Amino acid sequence: MRFKRILLKLSGESLMGKQGYGIDPERLSDYARQIKEVSEMGVQIGIVIGGGNIFRGLSGSQKGFDRVKGDQMGMCATVINSLALSSALGAIGVKNRVLTAIRMEPIGEFYTKWKAIEAMEAGYVCIFSAGTGSPYFTTDTGSSLRGIEIEADVMLKGTRVDGIYTADPEKDPTATKFNDITYKEVLARGLKVMDLTAICMCQDNNLPIYVFNMDIVGNLKKVMQGEEIGTLVHN
């Protein structure tokens, strides 16, 4: 088994599937089954989901919302997605807990590092929601923070593309893929892997990132089995 403990980062937009908004039940079910497969391998799993399928704080501020209020709305969107994933996992027999960065019992338990690690070691999938609990931080940064805190072996960034390219492969047909790349090169090239704060946190704390296509069913298990289907970012 490639990694013992992982932090899986999923984008909110990915939950939309082919819809333009909200949560696609089929996509949610696909993700839940992939997570179950890996959980049954004995992998300890922490998950962070974005909220962009419902509301994005930064775009809200561009439309006239107060930035802090907008970011708080985005945090609430991540909680909605986390509850949806929790429900989908529970429906197929996967023990899980939703932990929130802001107190909102009984919707979820208030997050602490020790509570999360204890739950994962007991076989629960932990879903971390509400970002960092503070405005001005993206869910990518929240993922980096949680990955570092729970001492994950890697952050797996599930996207709709199969890794990191020299340019956006959906716009530039000449873009070429990296199988692995250093943090320094990511920063020097200005590649849009995650925001700068998130990248620097992972670099400073030696947390590697593996970017892969989560939309292809079975890919999460392939990553755990050591198949090279994405891009590894490392020091």
Residue spans for each PLM region:
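C-terminal catalytic "cap/lid" subdomain
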Residues: 1-235
